[in-house]
């Protein structure tokens, strides 16, 4: 037995190598690995089907076609193992060697490898400093290259055309050597001395005068250094012999009818061999040079096609006009080797079927059709049948199963017990798309799915299909049960809130049973206990929704029972609650939000098991009561508000009024459009509000005959209010008015649809609607693809972010505060710090007590402490500041959101982050707003009202008081706060330039009082002092045009771009003496006007401080105000520069304007100390700062969006991270999607991994080199230890695609995009892939280094501990004995 065991080769253990290296093969290497030369283009003999000798399928080279049998049949069977047959030369071994043995072709002339030639930048060209064009001319025999100038003083590797060559030959009497084709290039490469060249290039780089020259030299130096360090020789880029792929990897398959299907590679190899043999013959015959040249060129082309068909010239096509698939195409793209076979494989032991709902299942179960189970569990059944003695052989077991005998079903029941299966629904967008269940055998052919897990799978029962997978090994079963069981995945990894929450019918049922009905049967009764309520309900003495009082015990604490106002329905619901959950959690109308909260509270207080039981009970009770409620809708439930016609008529009047203003020339066309749209948006809102108020209120008669308004039981209202189905938006279209629609381009059509679906639309209105609706469908299709691509890029960039250590010991962190927008707190500080780890001790601002110790996780109770202490800023540890070399430390990451405790070692947090951001991507729109095409544009905000009462405080506001006594704001970054008695800021608003403030400092105001107002459609330019208006450089026809409106016939003065660059249109304010008025010591009353400004004053008019002298109209509002939705998220993660980005100042200082240069405006920022900085701003862009303003570093000097690279350069990494996190969150928040900040931070961390070298110091680094931060730090440490000068680098922000391609692992990068380019570069550098990320390991077929695949779990041994028996136990045993 032992002998047999050792006789066969062992499969190689996947752990026997720890890294993989790629480099360029030398001709010796190729020959050494080869098992023989392929000399003939023949494949197999068409009569005998045996491989031809020396051909592409030769058995002598590649091994026998049948196991242990030589070609001629002299030696057969195992006993001759290892003998080489003397007749046919074939070794007697298993035929599988035909998958691994390489051959080779010796070429008659060297040939350039197309990857090193054409993959940009061309490596051969770079090394020799020849342009690609010239290089191609030489290689394809159209030009000569100097291989040895001898003493003619010619430059090395100079390229000559035919004529120039002949001339030079005459001139120097053939004193130099030149040649053409790959052989000449090879000679050049061989004669290069890389060490000398590297020195030379370093010197050149230091002496380089222009930036371009330096960059070019740096590029060459990089290639030279790569060759030096890797030990590859440059001449290996030119091939002397070509390896031939093992034949089984390019098979020839006989089809019926005597034809063959073959791999394209065989055709390509055949071409190479044919041309090579012809060339050899021509050379033997000493044919004319022209013919040989032509043949050499054809050989070069054939080899090019074999390696990368279509890279140069036209792709070689097969007989069916389809381009042949070359070796490169085998690797590239979605159907290439990497993505098709290595990263995604098809799996055995799996099946798929349609899903149906299984409402009677428990949460951990799924219904598996018997037919499927029988097929999936076959080997287990055979084993069990044999064990039980029903059968003796596998064959008879097979027969038994095929006959489906009754014993088989009993055995199946047994086998299935405790054996979880995995269910998966495509597309698997996040890890909850695959979950494990215990199978329950069912009749029929459809899989039954538990209704509560539908949200996670995003499944519905309109014909969706799901796949079943069976974990086979014990280890995989354990992992499946512990990690993937649906009962262990109650919380969502994206935001840590429950994802197993009742939906639809269940919500409606629970909502119905917890509603209150006024004056129902049994109203006002008092019950002594929970049971008494039950009895009364069953006896029909009290209505489910009556308002009653019940005496209830608090089960969590032993307090006295108390009388509680509640309803019988809520008491029934209480019966299923765990004791730990207080009754107050459900003593209210339970909407979907409240139910989610209930599951969350239950999970925190009662633990996982109780939550699962509660979820199942909620499901049953929900379905039960939604059946009892029997809610249905009819057309009469859509109540159209009475005031609708009045509102619409009023709006039409207003629109007419606006039209008149336009005709009279008071407003521009853009303003008219904006105002019209605003009027309709407001009216739609108004009608919707009235309609929703109508729906939600009923009028009933009380027992004493009075009319009382009570919450309504209108079915449509109940559905929307409970969150079961439908939204206010949809109801508004049913019973209000459809409102404004958008064109596909995103503009809003200014005639709204005044009808609703109940009244029905007119033909025109229907036509306008179809526009938006169809766009919605087209968008959805595009969106899915785009969202999937975004997820793929995110996963790729973040796949190696793994929790690698418990604590990195950093002293750095982020300061987090509440998120406010327009004075409103949109996200409280508590939500942002929950589950994070505190960096320093967090102290109570009043008492100074330690609320949270440093390095302590902030959980729910601590969050409450922090919020009640009123802290506004908290310092936390963050992924962004984590100092771990590889991966991230647990303390910086904080809580694992899906489990509710500190994250475990080995958790693949990068992939989770990518999934959490990508999965809701399909919910984001391609453009910002659309609901069935209706444009939902909020009416522009024009004023501010106080939300709370308190006293007013101005922060950094400069203002002048105008003649009405209002304060007019004169600067941009002012803020106004409302402070309560204790001095805490309750709300804070940014105040726009030109706004009217209607309150004074310290004034006490009430809630709802107006604070400020402004015009949202124009940007005013105001005067700060009183005086007389004078125009400067405002010349009609040059820098200003009187634009006459065709409709109104009225004219406006508009500043236009003048051809004369020196003209700077401005308005000056003169004092009584006729001099330019001074505002203060340094600033004059001079206002420069940007292009497009409308001048609103006449020359010589008298103005007061705070008056508007010109207006800049804002753009017409489109629906896609900003790049919304998905494209915006992609834009942020790709770190693209926005189209019109704002110039920002790099220093703090005072603004002054310099003279215009090259048609650009010059803004000078002068700091208190140091040199002033100048910024050029294109003419016609509006400069948002004024002379004399104080600006801070990072502030924009003009209108436009921020450029993330600028933020990084000026304000640093933390500010950039904050900007990216906030911007991404804003897009998701608009769609109502919750994502935890730490996921976005994880991705941003991966984008900031690299630095760019600015100054090399004494290091071996190259200038402008981009490398991982830790490599740079290591190199600097090494130099500092020797007392050298360290290098200086700046942080680099890479987009996610760029970052994925520049990872350390070439396998991961190659499988992502630009496969050939990545592999070319890696092979030249002789890169070593340490297999540290997930992707590389999946591709190499190893366990991934995350979770249970971590190295530290690999070689564990389990040792059973001896139980220690205490003396008392021994005594008991004696007594019992």
UniProtKB/Swiss-Prot annotation:
The keyword Chaperone does not apply. InterPro entries: DNA-dir_RpoC_beta_prime, DNA-dir_RpoC_beta_prime_bact, RNA_pol_asu, RNA_pol_N, RNA_pol_Rpb1_1, RNA_pol_Rpb1_3, RNA_pol_Rpb1_3_sf, RNA_pol_Rpb1_4. It catalyses: RNA(n) + a ribonucleoside 5'-triphosphate = RNA(n+1) + diphosphate. Keywords: DNA-directed RNA polymerase, Magnesium, Metal-binding, Nucleotidyltransferase, Transcription, Transferase, Zinc. Binds 1 Mg(2+) ion per subunit. DNA-dependent RNA polymerase catalyzes the transcription of DNA into RNA using the four ribonucleoside triphosphates as substrates. The RNAP catalytic core consists of 2 alpha, 1 beta, 1 beta' and 1 omega subunit. When a sigma factor is associated with the core the holoenzyme is formed, which can initiate transcription. This is DNA-directed RNA polymerase subunit beta'. The gene is rpoC.
């Amino acid at each position: 037995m032992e002998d047999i065991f050792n006789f066969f080769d062992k499969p190689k253990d996947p752990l026997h190598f720890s890294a993989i290296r790629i480099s360029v093969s030398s001709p010796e290497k190729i020959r050494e690995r080869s098992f023989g030369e392929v000399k003939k283009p023949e494949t197999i003999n068409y009569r005998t089907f045996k491989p031809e000798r020396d051909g592409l399928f030769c058995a002598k080279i590649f091994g026998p076609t049948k196991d242990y049998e030589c070609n001629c049949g002299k030696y057969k069977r195992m006993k001759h193992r290892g003998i080489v047959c003397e007749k046919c030369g074939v070794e007697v071994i298993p035929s599988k060697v035909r998958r691994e043995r390489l051959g080779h072709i010796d070429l008659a002339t060297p040939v350039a490898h197309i990857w090193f030639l054409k993959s940009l930048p061309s490596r051969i060209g770079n090394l020799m400093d020849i342009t690609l064009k010239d290089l191609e001319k030489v290689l394809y025999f159209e030009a000569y290259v100097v291989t040895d100038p001898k003493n003619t003083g010619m430059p090395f590797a100079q390229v000559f055309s035919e004529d120039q060559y002949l001339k030079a030959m005459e001139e120097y009497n053939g004193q130099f050597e030149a040649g053409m084709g790959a052989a000449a290039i090879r000679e050049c490469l061989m004669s290069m001395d890389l060490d000398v060249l590297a020195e030379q290039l370093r010197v050149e780089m230091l002496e380089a005068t222009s930036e371009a020259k330096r960059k070019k030299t740096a590029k060459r130096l990089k290639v030279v250094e790569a060759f030096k360090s890797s030990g590859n020789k440059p001449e290996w880029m030119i091939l002397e012999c070509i390896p031939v792929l093992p034949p089984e990897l390019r098979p020839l398959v006989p089809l019926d009818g005597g034809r063959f299907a073959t791999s394209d590679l065989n055709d390509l190899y055949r071409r190479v061999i044919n041309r090579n043999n012809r060339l050899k013959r021509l050379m033997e015959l000493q044919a004319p040079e022209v013919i040989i040249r032509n043949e050499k060129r054809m050989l070069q082309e054939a080899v090019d096609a074999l390696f990368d068909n279509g890279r140069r010239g036209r792709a070689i096509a097969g007989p069916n006009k389809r381009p042949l698939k070359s070796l490169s195409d085998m690797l590239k793209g979605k159907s290439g080797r990497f993505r098709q076979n290595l990263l995604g494989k098809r799996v055995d032991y799996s099946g798929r079927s349609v899903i149906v709902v299984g409402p009677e299942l428990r949460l951990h179960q799924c219904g598996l059709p018997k037919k499927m189970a029988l097929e999936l569990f076959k080997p287990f059944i055979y084993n069990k049948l044999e064990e039980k003695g029903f059968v003796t052989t596998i064959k008879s077991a097979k027969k038994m199963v095929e006959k489906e005998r009754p014993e088989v079903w009993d055995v199946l029941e047994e086998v299935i017990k405790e054996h979880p299966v995995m269910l998966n629904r495509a597309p698997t967008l996040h890890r909850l798309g695959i979950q494990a269940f215990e199978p329950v055998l069912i009749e029929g052919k459809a899989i039954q799915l538990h209704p509560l897990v539908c949200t996670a799978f995003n499944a519905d029962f309109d014909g969706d299909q799901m796949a079943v997978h069976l974990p086979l090994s014990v280890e995989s079963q354990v992992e499946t049960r512990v990690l993937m069981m649906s009962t262990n995945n109650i919380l969502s990894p994206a935001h840590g809130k429950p994802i197993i929450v009742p939906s639809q019918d269940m919500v409606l049922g629970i909502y119905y049973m917890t509603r209150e009905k006024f004056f129902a049967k049994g109203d006002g009764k008092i019950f002594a206990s929970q049971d008494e309520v039950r009895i009364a309900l069953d006896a029909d003495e009290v209505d489910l929704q009556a308002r009653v009082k019940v005496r209830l015990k608090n089960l969590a604490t032993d307090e006295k029972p108390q009388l509680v106002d509640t309803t019988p329905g809520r008491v029934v619901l209480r019966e299923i609650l765990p004791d730990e959950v207080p009754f107050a959690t459900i003593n209210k109308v339970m909407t979907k939000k409240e139910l989610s909260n209930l599951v969350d509270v239950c999970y925190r207080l009662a633990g996982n098991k109780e939550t699962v039981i509660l979820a199942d009970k909620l499901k049953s009770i929900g379905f039960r009561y939604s059946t009892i409620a029997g809610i249905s809708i009819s057309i009469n439930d859509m109540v159209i508000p009475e005031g609708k016609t009045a509102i619409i008529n009023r709006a039409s009047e207003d629109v007419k009024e606006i039209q008149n203003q336009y005709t009279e020339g008071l407003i521009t066309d853009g303003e008219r459009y904006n105002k019209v749209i605003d009027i309709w948006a407001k009216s739609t809102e108004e009608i919707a509000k009235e309609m929703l108020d109508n729906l939600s209120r009923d009028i009933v008669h009380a027992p004493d005959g009075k009319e009382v308004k009570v919450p309504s039981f209108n079915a449509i209202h109940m559905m929307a209010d409970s969150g079961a189905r439908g939204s206010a938006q949809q109801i508004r279209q049913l019973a209000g008015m459809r409102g404004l629609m958008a064109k596909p381009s995103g503009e809003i059509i200014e005639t709204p649809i005044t009808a609703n679906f109940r009244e029905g639309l007119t033909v025109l209105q229907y036509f306008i609607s179809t526009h938006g609706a169809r766009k919605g469908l087209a968008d959805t299709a595009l969106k899915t693809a785009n969202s999937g691509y975004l997820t793929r890029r995110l996963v790729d960039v973040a796949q190696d972010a793994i929790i690698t250590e418990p604590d990195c010991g950093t002293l750095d962190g982020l300061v987090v505060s509440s998120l406010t927008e327009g004075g409103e707190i949109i996200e409280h500080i508590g939500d942002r710090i929950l589950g994070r780890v505190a960096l320093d001790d967090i102290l109570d601002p009043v008492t100074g007590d330690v609320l949270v110790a440093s390095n302590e996780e902030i959980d729910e109770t601590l969050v409450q402490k922090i919020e009640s202490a009123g802290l506004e800023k908290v310092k936390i540890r963050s992924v962004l500041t984590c100092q771990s070399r590889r991966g991230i430390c647990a303390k910086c990451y904080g809580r694992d959101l899906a489990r509710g405790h500190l994250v475990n070692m080995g958790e693949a947090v990068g992939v989770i982050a990518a999934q959490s951001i990508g999965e809701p991507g399909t919910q984001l729109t391609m453009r910002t707003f659309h609901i069935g095409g209706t444009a939902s544009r909020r009416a522009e905000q024009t004023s501010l009202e106080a939300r709370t009462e308190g006293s007013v405080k101005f922060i950094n506001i400069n203002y002048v008081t105008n003649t009405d006594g209002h304060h007019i704001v004169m600067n941009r970054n002012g803020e106004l706060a409302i402070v309560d008695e204790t001095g805490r800021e309750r709300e804070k608003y940014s105040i726009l330039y030109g706004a009217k403030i209607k309150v004074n400092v310290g004034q006490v105001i009430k809630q709802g009082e107006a604070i400020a107002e402004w015009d949202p459609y124009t940007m005013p330019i105001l005067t700060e002092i009183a005086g007389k208006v004078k125009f400067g450089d405002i010349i009609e026809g040059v820098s200003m045009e009187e634009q006459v409106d065709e409709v109104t016939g009225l004219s406006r003065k508009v500043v236009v771009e003048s051809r004369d660059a020196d003209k700077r249109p401005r308005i000056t304010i003169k004092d009584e003496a006729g001099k330019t008025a001074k505002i203060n010591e340094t600033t004059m009353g001079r206002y420069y006007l940007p292009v497009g400004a409308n001048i609103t004053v006449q020359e010589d008019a008298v103005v007061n401080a705070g008056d508007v002298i010109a207006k800049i109209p804002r753009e017409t509002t489109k629906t896609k105000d900003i790049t919304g939705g998905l494209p915006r998220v992609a834009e942020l993660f790709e770190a693209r520069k926005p189209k019109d980005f704002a110039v920002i100042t790099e220093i703090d200082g005072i603004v002054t304007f310099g003279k215009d240069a090259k048609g650009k405006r010059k803004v000078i920022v002068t700091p208190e100390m140091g040199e002033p900085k100048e910024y050029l701003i294109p003419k016609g862009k509006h400069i948002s700062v004024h002379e004399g303003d104080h600006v801070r570093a990072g502030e924009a000097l003009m209108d436009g969006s921020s450029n993330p690279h600028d933020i990084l350069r000026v304000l640093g990494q933390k500010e950039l991270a904050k900007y990216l996190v906030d911007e991404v969150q804003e897009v998701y928040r608009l769609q109502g999607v919750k994502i935890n900040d730490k996921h976005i931070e994880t991705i941003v961390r991966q984008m900031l991994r690299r630095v760019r070298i600015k100054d090399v110091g004494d290091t071996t680094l190259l200038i402008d080199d981009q490398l991982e931060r830790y490599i740079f730090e290591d190199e600097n440490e090494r130099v500092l230890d020797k007392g050298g000068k360290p290098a200086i680098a700046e942080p680099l922000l890479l987009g996610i695609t760029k970052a994925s391609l520049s990872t350390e692992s070439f396998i991961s990068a190659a499988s992502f995009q630009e496969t050939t380019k990545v592999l070319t570069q890696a092979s030249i550098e002789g890169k070593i892939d340490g297999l540290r990320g997930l992707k590389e390991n999946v591709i190499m077929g190893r366990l991934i280094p995350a979770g249970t695949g971590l190295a530290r779990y690999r070689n564990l041994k389990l040792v059973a501990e001896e139980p220690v028996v205490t003396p008392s136990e021994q005594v008991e045993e004696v007594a019992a004995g």
